[in-house]
Structures are given as structure tokens and as C-alpha cells.
Amino acid sequence: PCFCSAEELGALREAQEAGKIRTGYHGEWAKCRNLSFEEIKANIEAGKPFVIRLKSPGSEENKVFFDDAIKGKIEMPENIIDEVLLKSDGIPTYHFAHACDDHFMRTTHVIRGEEWISSVPKHIELFKACGYKVPKYAHTPQVLKTDEETGDKRKLSKRKDPEAAVGYFVEGGF
């Protein structure tokens, strides 16, 4: 468990930024990483809120290699961050839920937007830590639209843009 408060994590981030160190809960910055059983028990008995983290065995020097079905072979640094698995309210984080859900739903291929590609190292680490088979990944480019008011490119919005909905094409007779 990690008992760090939001204020402590904020101070940690500020110190990392000031020292030009990769931000996040890792290595020597992960102050709850090596708490003794007695310390953990005392904090829980004192009612101190906590999250559950995965102690990452990753190293910045190591690389993760994977074949993306669209982008081809990709090399990225290993994840070194001790990712939160369960929030203090007991709700799993997106990343942990992604691994568990994909495993139990027998997902073999994950097809998603390229904005998620930076999460692959942490997802591979989570799948392996849980003993799950790592799915194949395919990262698609974002569908962009030129904003009529500004002329800028932006993501197609299912709330703002009617052509993002199937009904738009059905009504148009396509």
C-alpha cells in the first residue's frame, strides 16, 4: 500500500521537476515502496487512506519491444512507475481494469487510438505481472476534422459533430 497524500505526491513532483528528474512514483521517490509489515499495519489501523500500487521492476535502461499491427515494430523505455492499481476508494484504475477486463473477456487484439501508444509499456508490465497473455496492439491515427470557425485541425467529436454518429449516414441514405 501507498499512504502518500496528494500534498506529498505534489511535493515529490515539484522536487523531481526542479531536479530535472523523470516525474512519478518510482525508485528512491517511492517512499512507501519498502514499508515493513508493522508500518503498513500501523497506518491501516490508524485509518490512514491508501492506494495499492504495483512495484515496478522496470529500468530506464531497458527497452520494451512490441509489434503494432498498424505501426510495425516499436521500441520504448520500460515502465519504471509504481502504477496505482486500486484507488483509495477501492475502485480499480483504468490501466488495471484494462488488463483484467481484456484477460477475462479473452481479448486477443486491442485496437485503439495512437494517443494510447505511450501506455503500452505499463500495460505489458501489468499483463505479465498478473500472469495474463499480452494481447496484440493496433494503434490507429486520430480522425481529425478542420474546425469551420478557426481552420484548425481537431479530433472528431461524437458530441459536437453529427458525422461522427452512424445515424448521420443512415439519415443521409448512405
Q: What spans do the regions from the language model cover?
A:
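Conserved phosphate/anionic-ligand binding catalytic regions in large, soluble enzymes, centered on
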Residues: 174
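Active-site cores that bind ATP or allylic diphosphates and position pyrophosphate for catalysis
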Residues: 2-159, 163-171
